[in-house]
Amino acid sequence: CGPCFTTDHQMEQKCAECCGGIGKCYGPQCLCNR
């Protein structure tokens, strides 16, 4: 769900919000856990 930037310290939170609560950054991509 969207890109992940290592320079953004809030990326993990943004990724989780993008996924609706559960999501993690794997390299340059934000992936949602189902």
Curated annotation (Swiss-Prot):
Expressed by the venom gland. One of its GO terms (molecular function) is toxin activity. It is found in: Secreted. The modification Arginine amide is found at R34. InterPro entries: Scorpion_toxin-like_sf, Scorpion_toxinS_Cl_inh. Belongs to the short scorpion toxin superfamily. Chloride channel inhibitor family. Chloride channel ligand. Potently and reversibly inhibits CFTR chloride channels when the channels are in the interburst closed state. May also interact with chloride channels (probably ClC-3/CLCN3) and MMP2 at the surface of glioma cells. This complex may be then internalized via caveolae, thus inhibiting the chloride channels necessary for cell shrinkage and tumor propagation. This is Toxin GaTx1. The lineage of its organism: Eukaryota, Metazoa, Ecdysozoa, Arthropoda, Chelicerata.
